[in-house]
């Protein structure tokens, strides 16, 4: 954790990685695209030297639950500005429950703090908790306005859970690009958008994610750390955004998005694992 925080003020200029360095990754991604009849976008940003590589990095993909990191970052930002109190409570009503709410569905009739709602959102991907946060930060428009404020001109949020997960081809609503969201995560975790205290809180929520054990975490190199957030939606949408680092490796921001495929969830998960393994091999092979 200390190593990650050491880079909290570092946002280097982007330098495009040599094509040869990521040649195998690109070949692997293309092979998976063909095998799943999918559309895939990937971006990799090394925060130490600004080295950047992508595959379909400027194409739009459904945000799905990867928006939750941004929504909770907006809550932290608003708290810094005195616009919201993260310790304020919201009553949980049965009528507000939406699909997949493993934490909130057990607390109907009780109250939850906004801070705890973010914890549930980020660690279990609880959709009702996410809607509670959205309501507190000005809705989808509030999140999109925040993105524009920090320089992200591509990512947009238009709907709440669960509608935002529709994933229909050609629909610009609730989409991002792998390149844009990697840059945004860089600003949120290592830039000046949030205070160091809130950067640590956002990082902690991502580190304690409980629903991604079968994705990048399953092939994380020994001694490495990860902070991540995943998502899934209609028309084969599956995604993950992550920061990985080790004692000797500066944080690397990875975003992987799949869309427009009839592949099963297991097949999509396996695709993310294979792509992640290929990316990690680029960095571990350098230290051999």
Swiss-Prot record:
InterPro entries per the UniProt record, alphabetical = Beta-lactam/transpept-like, Beta-lactam_cat, Beta-lactam_class-A, Beta-lactam_class-A_AS
Q: Which UniProt keywords apply?
A: Antibiotic resistance, Disulfide bond, Hydrolase, Signal, Transposable element
Segments forming a coiled coil: none
Q: Which GO terms describe its biological process?
A: beta-lactam antibiotic catabolic process; response to antibiotic
User: What residues make up the catalytic site?
Assistant: 65 (acyl-ester intermediate)
Domain of life, per lineage: Bacteria
EC category name: hydrolase
Report if keyword Isomerase is assigned.
no
Under catalytic activity, the entry for this protein gives: a beta-lactam + H2O = a substituted beta-amino acid
The residues that hold substrate are 229-231
S-S bridge residues: 72-118
Chain ranges passing through the membrane: none
**Single Gene Ontology MF annotation:** beta-lactamase activity
EC numbers for this chain: 3.5.2.6
Signal sequence region: 1-17
Q: Which family does it belong to?
A: Belongs to the class-A beta-lactamase family.
Q: What else is known?
A: The class A beta-lactamase family has a specific amino-acid numbering system, sometimes called Ambler or ABL numbering and often misspelt as Amber. A multiple sequence alignment was used to derive a consensus sequence and then the consensus was numbered taking into account insertions and deletions. This allows use of identical numbers, e.g. for active site residues, despite differences in protein length. UniProt always uses natural numbering of residues, hence there appear to be differences in numbering between this entry and some papers.
Q: What is known about what this protein does?
A: Hydrolyzes both carbenicillin and oxacillin.
UniProt cross-references to NCBIfam families, sorted A to Z: bla_class_A (NF033103), carbeni_gen (NF000481), PSE (NF000480)
Enumerate the PANTHER family for this protein. Answer: BETA-LACTAMASE, BETA-LACTAMASE-TYPE TRANSPEPTIDASE FOLD CONTAINING PROTEIN
Q: What is this protein called?
A: Beta-lactamase CARB-3
Instruction: Please give the organism.
Output: Pseudomonas aeruginosa
Q: What gene makes this protein?
A: carB3
């Amino acid at each position: 954790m200390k190593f990650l925080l050491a880079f909290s003020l570092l946002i280097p200029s982007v330098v495009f990685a040599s094509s040869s360095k990521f040649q195998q990754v690109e070949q692997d991604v293309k092979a998976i695209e063909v095998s799943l009849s999918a559309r895939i976008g990937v971006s990799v940003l090394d925060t130490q030297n600004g080295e950047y590589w992508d595959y379909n990095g400027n194409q739009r993909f459904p945000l799905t639950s990867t928006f939750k990191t941004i929504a909770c970052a907006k809550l932290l930002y608003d708290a810094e500005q005195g616009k919201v109190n993260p310790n304020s409570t919201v009553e949980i009503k049965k009528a507000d429950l939406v699909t997949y709410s493993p934490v909130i569905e057990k607390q109907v009739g009780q109250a939850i703090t906004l801070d705890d709602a973010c914890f549930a959102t980020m660690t279990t991907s609880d959709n009702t908790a996410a809607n509670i946060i959205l309501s507190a930060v000005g809705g989808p428009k509030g999140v999109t306005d925040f993105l524009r404020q920090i320089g992200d001109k591509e990512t947009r949020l238009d709907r709440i859970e669960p509608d935002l997960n529709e994933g229909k081809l050609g629909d610009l609503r609730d989409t991002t690009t792998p390149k844009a969201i990697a840059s945004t995560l860089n600003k949120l975790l290592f830039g000046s958008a949030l205070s160091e205290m809130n950067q640590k809180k956002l990082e902690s929520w991502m580190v304690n994610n409980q629903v991604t054990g079968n994705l990048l975490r399953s092939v994380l190199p020994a001694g490495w750390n990860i902070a991540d957030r995943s998502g899934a939606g209609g028309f084969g949408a599956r995604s993950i955004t992550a920061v990985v680092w080790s004692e000797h490796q500066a944080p690397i921001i990875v975003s992987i998005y799949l869309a427009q495929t009839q592949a099963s969830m297991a097949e999509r998960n396996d695709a993310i694992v294979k792509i992640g393994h290929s990316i990690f091999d680029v960095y571990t092979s350098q230290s051999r």
